[in-house]
């Protein structure tokens, strides 16, 4: 978000002092607005911010899968590899990420950072054996990765090249991720999907994910 006039902050209550402090820090960074994250479990935050010029720009349904209770997933059905086996595909993955990131609902103004910056948060911190890549011959068509914390897993960004969307590749990646989670003893998998992506929400429901809460993202002026 370096090129956007917003600094990100979480507010878990309608706390004016916290909002003003976040605004002060944002202005120190040269930002004149805030992108505030909260959840539908604290609706008072939205009620606090909207009269101050904020509007909701995105909503994410956070769903969870009980890995042990979930049925064994079907095979992916498409050629898959992992970043552990194909580290040479890093630059291709970056190009897919750069194309896909602004295609997300509510992120049309976003621009991907440099390759080096993207690697620092979008590639290198994540388990290479759980970083799945869809292949067409030697060419990457898409990817999806897991973040792992103890026995809990979290679906990171899933990106499919525009020309390859609508072919079930995201579902193939998700089946591979569920299989990996089972093999590696994870207890739960969590995922967050924008409410304007009904096909992804339906995919989660099909594989046994259950909604837990909704994250709400607002943008507006700093105090």
Where are these regions (language model features)?
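Conserved donor-binding loop and adjoining core beta-sheet/short helix segment
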Residues: 1-41, 136-162
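Conserved acetyl-CoA-binding loop-helix of GNAT-fold acetyltransferases
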Residues: 14-28, 160, 166-179, 202, ...
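Glycine-rich acetyl-CoA-binding "A-motif" of GNAT/NAT acetyltransferases
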Residues: 18, 128, 138-142, 199, ...
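Conserved GNAT acetyl-CoA-binding A-motif
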Residues: 29-39, 181-193
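Conserved active-site tyrosine of GNAT-family acetyltransferases
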Residues: 49, 204, 209
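Flexible, substrate/cofactor-facing loop regions flanked by secondary structure
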Residues: 76-153
């Amino acid at each position: 978000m370096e090129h956007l006039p917003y600094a990100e902050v979480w507010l878990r209550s309608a706390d004016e002092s916290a909002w003003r402090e976040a605004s002060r820090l944002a202005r120190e960074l040269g930002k004149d607005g805030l992108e505030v994250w909260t959840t539908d479990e604290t609706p008072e935050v939205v009620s606090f911010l909207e009269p101050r010029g904020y509007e909701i720009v995105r909503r994410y349904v956070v769903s969870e899968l009980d890995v042990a209770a979930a049925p064994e997933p079907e095979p992916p059905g498409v050629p898959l590899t992992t970043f552990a086996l194909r580290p040479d595909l890093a630059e291709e993955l970056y190009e897919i990420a750069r194309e896909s990131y602004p295609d997300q609902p509510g992120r049309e103004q976003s621009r991907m950072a440099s390759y080096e910056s993207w690697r620092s948060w979008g590639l290198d911190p994540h388990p290479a054996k759980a970083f799945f890549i869809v292949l067409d011959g030697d060419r990457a068509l898409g990817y999806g990765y897991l973040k792992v914390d103890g026995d809990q897993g979290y679906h990171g960004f899933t990106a499919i090249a525009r020309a390859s969307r609508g072919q079930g590749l995201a579902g193939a990646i998700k089946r591979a991720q569920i299989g990996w989670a089972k093999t590696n003893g994870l207890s739960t998998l969590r995922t967050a999907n924008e409410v304007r992506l009904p096909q992804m929400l339906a995919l989660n429901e099909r594989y046994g994910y259950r909604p837990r809460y909704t994250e709400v993202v607002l943008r507006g002026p700093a105090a």
